[in-house]
């Protein structure tokens, strides 16, 4: 499965009955809940990475990607925009890119 295909499925679930789909149920709870769930999954992935459990990390990484896409959908951010931003950054040094970001006073 590609991220594009998964994101398309998630977008379809935005209009589905929450009783029919875990994704629809999560999306119906709004961006805050989707962000919370993404954070939980990210922490679980970090724990597995530190433990060095490759199989568990693989599963948690899949959860992180899924929940990131759900959060993006909940916030009306298109995956194509995220990929375009990565493309924009591709030819920029990581150090230069970070120095060029807006910093609050």
UniProtKB/Swiss-Prot annotation:
It comes from the Bacteria. It is found in: Cytoplasm. It is an enzyme of class 3 (hydrolase). GO terms for cellular component: cytoplasm. GO terms for molecular function: ATP binding; phosphoribosyl-ATP diphosphatase activity. Coiled coil: none annotated. GO terms for biological process: L-histidine biosynthetic process. Its main location: cytoplasm. Keywords: Amino-acid biosynthesis, ATP-binding, Cytoplasm, Histidine biosynthesis, Hydrolase, Nucleotide-binding. Its EC number is 3.6.1.31. Pfam families: PRA-PH. Pathway: Amino-acid biosynthesis; L-histidine biosynthesis; L-histidine from 5-phospho-alpha-D-ribose 1-diphosphate: step 2/9. It catalyses: 1-(5-phospho-beta-D-ribosyl)-ATP + H2O = 1-(5-phospho-beta-D-ribosyl)-5'-AMP + diphosphate + H(+). NCBIfam families: histidine_hisI (TIGR03188), PRK00400.1-3 (NF001611), PRK00400.1-5 (NF001613). Belongs to the PRA-PH family. This is Phosphoribosyl-ATP pyrophosphatase. The gene is hisE.
């Amino acid at each position: 499965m590609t991220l594009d295909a998964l994101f398309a499925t998630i977008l379809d679930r935005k209009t589905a009955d929450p009783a029919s789909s875990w994704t629809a149920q999560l999306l119906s709870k709004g961006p805050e809940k989707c962000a919370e769930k993404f954070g939980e999954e990210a922490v679980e992935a970090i724990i597995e990475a530190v433990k060095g459990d490759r199989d568990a990390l693989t599963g948690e990484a899949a959860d992180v990607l899924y929940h990131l896409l759900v959060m993006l959908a909940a916030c009306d951010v298109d995956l194509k925009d995220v990929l375009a931003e990565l493309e924009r950054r591709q030819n920029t040094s990581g150090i230069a890119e970070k120095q060029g970001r807006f910093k609050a006073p």
